[in-house]
């Protein structure tokens, strides 16, 4: 078992992030010392921590991450496919807005002398 600091370094998360994920019920430590309250993580949790980090980078909501980590591969795929669809939609909307702004910038202003 690793201390929270050792585990955090190994998986690329901060100890405060691991505490937050524990408090939210997303990634619980393998063991919490009843006297000190220290959290300990097992090597078996590295995959879930790495997946959690990747999903947060993809802006997946915590509720969806919890479902992915707790669910079977088919339901995880469903959750992630839905998230990818939402991301594509937001990207399309943002792209259209930038294109419209570019067209406005490229048009001469009213009253401008050319």
PLM-predicted stretches and their roles:
Residues 1-61:
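Basic helix-turn-helix/winged-helix DNA-binding cores
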Residues 40, 113-114:
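Solvent-exposed, well-ordered amphipathic alpha-helical segments
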Residues 65:
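Hydrophobic positions on the alpha-helical face of helix-turn-helix-like DNA-binding modules
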Residues 69-113:
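Short, charged amphipathic alpha-helical surface segments
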